[in-house]
Each structure stands twice: as C-alpha cells, then as structure tokens.
Amino acid sequence: MTGGGTRLPVIGGVQPPAAAPGFERIAIIGLGTLGGSLAAAVRQAWPRSLVIGVDTRDVIETAMRLHAIDVGSDDLMIAGDADLVVLAGGVAESARVLPHLADAVASEAIVLALGGGSAVTERAGGLPGRLPLVLGLPAVELRGRGIHASSADLFRGRRWTITPITALPEAVERIHGLVRAVGGDPVAGSGRRPGGQADAL
C-alpha cells in the first residue's frame, strides 16, 4: 500500500532482536530450585548467552532435558571462561566452592552468591580482585526442592536484596541488570567487606 495508508504487520516477518545480554557466559553452580530457575530465566531473557551448569551428573542430565542450561558438568573447571559465576547450592556449598574459584575461573568474572552469611563473607578475602563477590537474596517462596521444582517465572515481581562484599559499584549495577532481566526488583543491601561488620542476610 502506498501513500499515507496504514502499514499492516507482516505475518512471519522479521522479529525484533533479542535484548543484548548483560553477561555472555553464565556459570551456575548448584542446579536446585533456585539455580535451575535462574538458569531457565536467563535462557529466556538472554537467549544469546551461554548458560553453564555445574552439579552432579544426574542433575546435569535432567537440566539438559529441561532445556535449563546449554552445557554442564560435575567439574568446576567448565566455568573457566564464565564472566558471571552464580553460587546457588546453599550457604555451606558456596563456602566450600569459594576457595576453588580462583583456580577454576581463569578470566575476570563477577561472583554472585544466592544467600549469604559469615561462612561466605569470611572467605571473600581469599578471592583475587578479578573475582568480585556480591550477595543476592531473592524474596521467593520455594514450593519444592530440586531441578524439577524450578521455574523460569520464579523471580518475576520478586524483590532481591543485593549486597556488595568485595564488588565495586559497576559490578553491582551489572547484577542489578541481571535481576531486572529475569523479572526481579533489585534493592540495595548494606555491604560488608572482609574484616567489617557482618550483614544480616
């Protein structure tokens, strides 16, 4: 149609491009309800990002069948090229993994721990400067356990308390972008640096 007529949508036409991902390679360590939900939500929000899962072989196989991750392994070294590492296996597991991240992750990456506590923050000082740590506490109600209870919509409309531990504002803002991308609402928590007063997270 020419002139000033109305342009009708073309069926099967070119779709608008997906939003540019805030992170290119996201490694999620622990694919339970939280980790699996975050993996699925990230794949929806940022389809061009590579989502890497780290868990037991059985869980990795299930996550692959559910299309929650792109690749996975029970070996932490698969996270070596990640630019975001998410610790989603619970406080005790996060504290256990933290000392091994410097050897496993070769490049610069932001480390996001889902949940916190002294067991995690006290080990933050052992991380090199290229691995800044942020705590993220999503206000969600879990209705089950494990990867089968995960949902890409778990974080939609939910508040996240974001607390920098060794991270600078630029890294924290990137985590805010992640939270917004999966439908959440990031709010600032009071930071704690190693040797300072602990947060009530």
Where are the regions that the model predicts?
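Short, well-ordered alpha-helix to beta-strand connector turns
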Residues: 23, 69, 82, 108, ...
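Rossmann-like NAD(P)-binding element
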Residues: 75-110
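Short secondary-structure boundary/capping segments
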Residues: 18, 76-77, 103, 125-126, ...
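Glycine/small-residue-rich loop that forms an oxyanion/phosphate-binding "nest" at active or ligand-binding sites
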Residues: 96-142
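Rossmann-fold dinucleotide-binding core
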Residues: 125-189, 193-198
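Glycine-rich, N-terminal phosphate-binding loop of Rossmann-like dinucleotide-binding domains
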Residues: 88-90, 115, 164
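NAD(P)+-binding Rossmann beta1-loop-alpha1 motif at the extreme N-terminus of oxidoreductases
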Residues: 2-75, 80
